């Protein structure tokens, strides 16, 4: 959620306020999408997962949670407040959750329409159009063998047809939108559309043919899989030996890292490849639709994500606060009309730069509240350097760790509450040799810490008074 809110606002989490999952971006927050909408010439739309508001239930320690438009629990569907525009989005069709554990009225209504169109799609799940929404969602969510040993690895073999899976929901709605736009169904001359897939994310649940598309015995484990963390920070050592609760990981839903076998890891990786391949195919169909409907030549296309997955790196899976490269080094592909093609750029950049880049491409002014940098210079010349360093904020409420990370061309430094990481990315790209405790690197550590503290101070919220004195 923090990085998704950063992509919309162009602000750091400590500024826009969504510092961890389970915190809503407040309605009325300024976003770059608002700017495009208010220009009067853009229709703005999103299909899929947005996660600017939480989709958890009112339960346990969160009994007083506010209602969210993105709630994924059927018993609350009748109470959901509908905001329009939604953070600047004219048109929204949502799906919340991950894998087979997806829900939302928009998704369930689409499933019912697909089953009505082709009744055979409902047969594997015994879905009937007369079923209440809650029952349909339950059938989608638990269409699996609960005794399957793969479940302990967050790998799910289920009965949901490819045609009803969340990836298809996002793809089909995006293509339908492009068709409508090309036919003149909207009054605006331009569009912005988010095609946002819930996958890839655990539980890894590739549907149909995608489940067996990659065989575990044919995949390889990461080079860092055998890292025993003797040279890691105390925080990482503890997770390796006991599996502490972190974002996306807790005891009982996954093996302790030190106990993982190569066979286990290959099963998880193979399943993750399956969901990624389905997304690859879906993206290909969306790009084909752009061409088919005559929109390709004048459309900017950006492919990126909100975070990576550790995927077995250093024997860890899922998310942080383990700021290894597999988690933080994410894809960013961009195609612009008549732009340079098939080129790589080595300049540092981050998600916070996306909204300013889009606004500049659209010829819109960049507001003062944004804190990133436009990437237009590297789109004109891949040799350009836009940034010399990147700041990453990650607050982990499970362990009360507020990590701050600075990335430079050569170094990664991460500060925890009472320890840290220091890696030379040029000489140790696999991040196996933590230099934080090596006194011979104190000088560079202090230099990087000063840069980190200076940058953190510079981007922090302005001090505001309620009254003059």
Q: What are these regions, as identified by a protein language model?
A:
Residues 1-412, 420, 429-433, 437-450, ...:
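Formylglycine-dependent sulfatase
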Residues 331, 452-460:
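A short, conserved beta-to-alpha structural element at the edge of catalytic cores
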Residues 423:
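Conserved, charged catalytic cores of large soluble enzymes
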Residues 426:
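Residues forming the ATP-binding cleft of Hanks-type serine/threonine protein kinase domains
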Residues 461-469:
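Short, charged, surface-exposed hinge/linker loops at domain edges
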């Amino acid at each position: 959620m923090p990085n998704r809110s950063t992509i919309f606002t162009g602000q750091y989490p400590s500024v826009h306020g969504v510092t961890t999952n389970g915190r809503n971006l407040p309605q009325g927050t300024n976003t770059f999408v608002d700017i495009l909408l208010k220009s009067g010439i853009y229709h703005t739309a999103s299909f899929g997962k947005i996660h600017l508001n939480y989709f958890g239930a009112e339960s346990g320690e969160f009994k007083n949670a506010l209602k969210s438009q993105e709630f994924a629990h059927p018993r609350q569907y009748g109470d959901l407040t509908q905001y329009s525009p939604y953070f600047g989005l004219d048109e929204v069709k949502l799906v919340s959750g991950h894998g087979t554990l997806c829900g939302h009225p928009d998704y369930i209504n689409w499933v019912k329409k697909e089953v009505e169109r082709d009744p055979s799609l409902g047969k594997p799940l015994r879905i009937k159009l007369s079923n209440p929404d809650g029952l349909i969602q339950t059938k989608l969510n638990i269409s699996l063998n609960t005794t399957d040993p793969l479940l302990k690895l967050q790998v799910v073999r289920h009965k949901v047809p490819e045609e009803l899976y969340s990836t298809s929901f996002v793809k089909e709605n995006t293509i339908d939108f492009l068709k409508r736009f090309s036919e003149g169904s909207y009054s605006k001359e331009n569009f912005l559309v988010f095609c946002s897939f819930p996958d890839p994310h655990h539980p890894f649940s590739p549907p149909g043919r995608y489940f067996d598309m990659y065989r575990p015995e044919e995949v390889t484990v990461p080079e860092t899989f055998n890292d025993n963390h003797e040279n890691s920070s105390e925080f990482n050592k503890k997770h390796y030996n006991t599996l502490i609760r972190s974002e996306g990981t807790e005891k009982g839903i996954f093996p302790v890292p030190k106990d993982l076998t190569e066979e286990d890891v290959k099963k998880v990786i193979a399943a993750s490849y399956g969901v990624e391949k389905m997304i690859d195919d879906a993206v290909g169909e969306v790009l084909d639709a752009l061409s088919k409907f005559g929109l390709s030549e004048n459309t900017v296309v950006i492919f990126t994500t909100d975070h990576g997955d550790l995927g077995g790196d250093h024997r860890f899976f899922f998310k942080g606060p383990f700021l290894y490269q597999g988690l933080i080094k994410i894809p960013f592909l961009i195609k612009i009309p008549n732009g340079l093609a098939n080129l790589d750029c080595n300049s540092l950049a981050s998600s916070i730069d996306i909204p300013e880049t889009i606004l500049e491409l659209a010829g819109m002014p960049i507001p003062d509240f944004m804190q990133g940098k436009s990437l237009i210079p590297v789109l004109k010349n891949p040799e350009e350097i836009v940034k010399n360093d990147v700041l990453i904020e990650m607050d982990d409420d499970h362990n009360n760790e507020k990590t701050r990370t600075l990335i430079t061309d050569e170094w990664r430094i991460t500060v925890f509450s009472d320890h840290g990481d220091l890696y030379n990315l040029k000489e140790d790209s696999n991040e196996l040799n933590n230099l934080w405790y090596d006194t011979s690197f104190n000088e560079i550590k202090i230099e990087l810490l000063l840069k980190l503290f200076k940058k953190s101070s510079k981007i922090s919220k302005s001090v505001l008074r309620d009254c003059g004195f």
